Amino acid sequence: MIELKKVYKEYVNDKVVTKVLFDINLKINKGEYIAIMGPSGSGKSTLMHILGLLDTPTKGEYFFNNKKVGKMEDEELSEYRNKKIGFVFQNFNLLPKTSVWDNVYLPLFYSKDKVNIKDVDKSIEEVGLKHRRDYLSNQLSGGEKQRVAIARSLVNNPDIIFADEPTGNLDSKTGLQIVSILKKLNDHGKTIILVTHEKITAEYANRIISMNDGKITKDTEEFKTRKVDKNTQLK
């Protein structure tokens, strides 16, 4: 599904070069639940931005569904981002004073294809917010806002969900509710790529990629995956 070969990333600002990623080699298969883990400044968010087609490598090759990303035109890249990828971020990125329903509908508003309005209600129900569909975003708790963000990422039925520190602004119990939603989506076939600095959050994944100083230091599949407590699951 995804393959990176000898990927490097650096930024140049006022002739100052900052090297962020070094010699990244990575394969991600369809249906995996992966946690990318590391301290602040380790390069994990930059790696996610490259994987999610929000940024490009300085050097190296990136293949998405066997297509070389570096040779894609801007229109094709945009289509991949809109149809095959869903994003969830730490700060929710919701429109203020706008209803849950309208926030979730937003990606469909920009779609060039024929849309099915029922997909909005389906996505809202999938994250347990059917009873909040008409609430404004500023009337919601932090956990509810993150659920809206997940519903919005689902509305185009993407193959992959990228979640960058989705529990970072939440208390531990609410964070585990978000983890339970991501786990449920993975159980239903979605590929989940989660960026986190929290070990307990990473342990709900099936594979943990550890990073430090821009390098992958460990890629672990042989561990006991933490189970979601039924008391934290959405009803």
Locate each region found by the language model.
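ABC family nucleotide-binding domain
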Residues: 2-24, 28-205
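A short hydrophobic/aromatic micro-motif that marks alpha-helical segments and, especially, helix-coil
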Residues: 28, 212-213
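Serine/proline-rich low-complexity intrinsically disordered segments, especially terminal tails, linkers
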Residues: 42-44, 212, 235
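Residues at the C-termini of beta-strands that transition into short coil/loop
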Residues: 73, 212, 220
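Conserved short hydrophobic beta-strand within the ABC ATPase nucleotide-binding domain
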Residues: 208-210
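Conserved beta-strand-loop-alpha-helix hinge in the C-terminal portion
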Residues: 215-235
